[in-house]
Amino acid sequence: PHPPTPAINTLYLSSAASDVYKRQNSATTATIGSMMHPEMVKGGYDERFAAATAASGGVVGIIIPPSIIFIVYGFLLNLPISDLFVGGIIPGALMVIGMMVACWIVCSMNGWGHLISLSLNRVTKTAFGSWLGFFAIGLVLWGIYTGKFSPTEAAGVTVGFCMIVGLISLPLYRMLGFEGNEDKPVQDKSYAEMALVEGFTVTEIPSIVIRSAQITGILAPMIAVSVVMQQILSLLGAKETIEAFVTGMGGYYAVLFTAMAIVFVAGMVLESLPNTIILAPILAPIAHSIGVDPVHFAVIFLVGGSIGFITPPYGLNLYVASGVTGVPYFRLLRYTVPYLMSLIFVWLLVALVPELSTILLPNR
């Protein structure tokens, strides 16, 4: 016997790993969703549930370090980025586990995923074939956490590493006779074949740069508009209004949960980046004034913001998943409910147990 959800568990783990270097939830949903959705449908999953799963898989992107939103938050609030990265490790893992459990319950109740089976040979070869990707991730984390280079420098080092590996791998791939075996089943490939990536040629670099620029270009106008919007809200007295409303709630938990409610509602209509730029400078000082640890509140804030990616009426990941899977937006909405419930449970747990965000921090 085997669990009914190995394909979806694979989606969540690959989404979490992909988010580490993409650092953009919608990009992860598009990439992983387009690859995994057809396989999940073939494996006996309902297409609407598979699409909703692809959308929810990208949610953890802003929590799993290194995250660009943590960098923005740290810059806005003058907090150590390395501390924020460490603070997101356990909550990010809990989010992934929570969605896996929700998925397992739903699939068990509906009998989905019965055609998917686990193979130790396939799992070990796939894990072995991922070593270069995990090495790149480890290089980023090692460099940032040891202070060898800044997050910006880490990005440059990683790009350089991937470029070198990609350019070297293709000649080796061809020389060893592996070219043309891309569609060969994993279990039939040798470990040597799995250890190499297909790579690319120098002529493909311009298209890679263009694709990267397209993704990066999404952020610039969002930041510009968010900064202007923040200034407009400031001129209109929104900052003082929100501060007065939140602080007027009274006790510790009343203030904390009011701030969380504001973040949650804003996350329904705003992307995480403008949400952070606009609300973090307003709510963080209030949270600090009632005794909430700065790193703890940062994690609370960003976990709440991440839930907005699959929360209507905006739910950016829902639109992306609908686009890449062909499942109409309104048909996949109700299948996100189990994931929303699990994420909200984890969010409340993180808010009520500060140690989940701070236990790995030094000198705490």
Model-derived regions: residue spans:
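Alpha-helical transmembrane segments of multi-pass membrane transport proteins
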Residues: 15-364
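Single conserved hydrophobic/aromatic residue that forms the stacking wall/gate
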Residues: 1-17, 21
